[in-house]
């Protein structure tokens, strides 16, 4: 299930106002910081910033805190393989669950985790991986799946036009 519009996300690991001001106002922000355990101050600043510019804000891999702080949703990374990660919580209305996957097995897991949007990567060649999906494999893997898939990885000016070929 694909939509015809593009959504753009930016992953951030800290509240840096000068970096945030360089982003377009219609970019959704995902806070992902696995190094700093005490990051509540950053999260609260980012929440306020996103509220002021009217953009969506997601927290990575902490559904309990995402619900408690009334964020727009949660991002579940590919390494989170807990099938019942979401089922134990009463989700607020319009709470988005975004996942990340690299193959069919991970896609099916993210669907079981109730993800309504899934980053699928890498679509194009990237330095840190020998394998990439390509347009045809991306389209085949997302065929008849009930989620919105987001292309991630290796997108640049040379292959940007190929994005239009994705389902």
Predicted regions and their residues:
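Short, small-residue-enriched loops and turns at beta-alpha junctions
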Residues: 36-37, 125-130
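Charged helix-capping and loop-helix junction motifs
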Residues: 44, 131-140
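Conserved N-terminal beta1-alpha1 strand-loop-helix module at the mouth
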Residues: 1-84, 89-117, 146-147, 155-165
């Amino acid at each position: 299930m694909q939509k015809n519009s593009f959504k753009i996300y930016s992953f951030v690991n800290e509240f840096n106002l000068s970096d945030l001001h360089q982003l377009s106002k219609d970019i959704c922000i995902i806070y992902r910081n696995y190094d700093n355990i005490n990051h509540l101050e950053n999260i609260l600043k980012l929440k306020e910033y996103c509220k002021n510019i009217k953009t969506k804000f997601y927290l990575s891999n902490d559904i309990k805190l995402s619900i408690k702080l009334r964020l727009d949703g949660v991002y579940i990374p590919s390494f989170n393989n807990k099938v019942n990660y979401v089922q134990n919580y009463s989700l607020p209305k319009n709470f988005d669950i975004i996942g990340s996957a690299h193959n069919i097995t991970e896609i099916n897991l993210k669907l079981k985790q109730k993800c309504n949007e899934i980053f699928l990567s890498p679509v194009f060649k990237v330095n840190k991986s020998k394998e990439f999906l390509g347009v045809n494999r991306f389209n085949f893997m997302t065929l008849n799946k009930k989620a919105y898939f987001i292309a991630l990885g290796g997108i640049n000016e040379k292959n940007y036009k190929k994005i239009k070929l994705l389902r």
